[in-house]
């Protein structure tokens, strides 16, 4: 019998992406609530408790409510795409390439929290340097990023694409999270192995999908003897054997005149770059990915859990 999968929130941006990716699969059975019944709490609870894996594509509070509905049913495993459980020690963090052991932790977990799009890029750059002893305690990390507007969900998509929307956004690029209290900062801190919260400055561009995350560093403030080449080597070693996360060779990065935010639109992969001048005192670490990566991450984590 095929495992039963219920996507709670299948009509939202992330839920639709996951459902599209799973269309046509015969190895799983997709449970579904008709859109007209999606606010039927009794039907929703029944679907959640009938599933082998419940994939939650909901706002934080609704995800917490869904988890309560299945908390007593050990037959149901959960993948959550909200921010509600990403730093909860009782949940496996769903970034399988983050460490060598992470895929196994996901595979054996009952509860898995999908990583956010910005944190995936930031953690992907920062964690290997912390693990290698290159990035010292107390370093004032800065993370700058630009995302496609689809990351803002249906409301922002309408604001960006419909000029007649009452709150239409016409700017080609804008900053937000101006008080520096973005909800992804705790996630970056915990899973980036940082002892000090980074300054995070997110922004949105007038393109639907894609993302660039930047972490600039002063070499003189890192571990003694750190160079652009040693940082690159640490990233290469950390992701050796991985197919989803790739580290671009320094020679290829040097040949680039620009980085295109939409290059990986619709793809599951992430590219990491190290930019700078050989012998210089600064480097800029860059992660390139699709901002809607929660969808492929969710399916990847589901496959890991089903294979266990």
Curated annotation (Swiss-Prot):
<dbReference type="GO" id="GO:0005737">
    <property type="term" value="C:cytoplasm"/>
</dbReference>
<dbReference type="InterPro" id="IPR036291">
    <property type="entry name" value="NAD(P)-bd_dom_sf"/>
</dbReference>
<comment type="similarity">
    <text>Belongs to the NAGSA dehydrogenase family. Type 2 subfamily.</text>
</comment>
<dbReference type="Pfam" id="PF01118">
    <property type="entry name" value="Semialdhyde_dh"/>
</dbReference>
<keyword id="KW-0560">Oxidoreductase</keyword>
<protein>
    <recommendedName>
        <fullName>N-acetyl-gamma-glutamyl-phosphate reductase</fullName>
        <ecNumber>1.2.1.38</ecNumber>
    </recommendedName>
</protein>
<keyword id="KW-0963">Cytoplasm</keyword>
<dbReference type="InterPro" id="IPR010136">
    <property type="entry name" value="AGPR_type-2"/>
</dbReference>
<keyword id="KW-0055">Arginine biosynthesis</keyword>
<dbReference type="Pfam" id="PF22698">
    <property type="entry name" value="Semialdhyde_dhC_1"/>
</dbReference>
<dbReference type="GO" id="GO:0003942">
    <property type="term" value="F:N-acetyl-gamma-glutamyl-phosphate reductase activity"/>
</dbReference>
<dbReference type="InterPro" id="IPR000534">
    <property type="entry name" value="Semialdehyde_DH_NAD-bd"/>
</dbReference>
<comment type="pathway">
    <text>Amino-acid biosynthesis; L-arginine biosynthesis; N(2)-acetyl-L-ornithine from L-glutamate: step 3/4.</text>
</comment>
<dbReference type="GO" id="GO:0051287">
    <property type="term" value="F:NAD binding"/>
</dbReference>
<dbReference type="GO" id="GO:0006526">
    <property type="term" value="P:L-arginine biosynthetic process"/>
</dbReference>
<keyword id="KW-0521">NADP</keyword>
<keyword id="KW-0028">Amino-acid biosynthesis</keyword>
<dbReference type="InterPro" id="IPR023013">
    <property type="entry name" value="AGPR_AS"/>
</dbReference>
<comment type="function">
    <text>Catalyzes the NADPH-dependent reduction of N-acetyl-5-glutamyl phosphate to yield N-acetyl-L-glutamate 5-semialdehyde.</text>
</comment>
<dbReference type="InterPro" id="IPR050085">
    <property type="entry name" value="NAGSA_dehydrogenase"/>
</dbReference>
<feature type="active site">
    <location>
        <position position="117"/>
    </location>
</feature>
